[in-house]
Amino acid sequence: MGNEQKMIDRIIADAKQEAQEILDKAKSEADLKVNSANEKAEKEMASYTKLAEAEAEKAASKEISGAYMEAKKQILSKKQEILEEVILEAKNKLLNLKDNEYEEIILNMIEKSNCTDDSEIVLSKKDKKTLKDVLSKKGIKVSDETRDITGGFIVKKGDIEYNYSFEAIIAVEHEYIEQIAAEILFN
C-alpha cells in the first residue's frame, strides 16, 4: 500500500498544483479584465467630465450673453428715453420763448419758407392773436382760418399746404435731431 498511497498522494499533489495554476491563470485574467474595465471607465468618466464641463461652459456663456444683450437693450432704451426728453424739452423751449423771440423765429421761418405773394399763413388761434398785426405790417397775408397746432405755421397756396408747425418740423427732423442729441449726450 505504500506505493499506492504515494501514487495517490502524487496524483492529489499534481491535481492541487494544476488547480492552483488554473486559479492563478483565472485570477490573472480576471485582474486584466478588471484593470481594463477600470481604465475604460476612467476614460469614459474623463470624457463625460469634459463633456459636462463643455456643456456647463456653453450654458454659462449663453447666460452671460443673454444678460449682456439685456443690459444693452436697457441702455439703448434709456438713451432713447433721454433723447425723447431732450426733443420734448426743445419743443417746450420753443413754445415758451418770450414773445419777441418767438416772433423773430416765426418771421425767419416764413422768410425761409416757400411763402409767396399768392400764399397765406395759417396760424394757431393763440399765434393769430399775437402775430397777425406784426405779419400784416411785413406784408404777409394771414389767413382767417386757424389750425390746431402748438407753434409754427402752415403756408397755404390754393389747395396746397406746406406744414411748418413745430410738430411737423420735429417729426421730419426727428432722426437728425436724435443724431445730434446723441452725439452731444453720449460722445
Swiss-Prot record:
Pfam families named in the record: vATP-synt_E
One CC-aspect GO term: proton-transporting two-sector ATPase complex, catalytic domain
Gene Ontology molecular functions: ATP binding; proton-transporting ATP synthase activity, rotational mechanism; proton-transporting ATPase activity, rotational mechanism
Keyword rRNA-binding: no
Entry-linked SUPFAM superfamilies: V-type ATPase subunit E-like
Keywords, ordered alphabetically: ATP synthesis, Hydrogen ion transport, Ion transport, Transport
Superkingdom, taxonomy of origin: Bacteria
Family, as annotated: Belongs to the V-ATPase E subunit family.
Protein name, per record: V-type ATP synthase subunit E
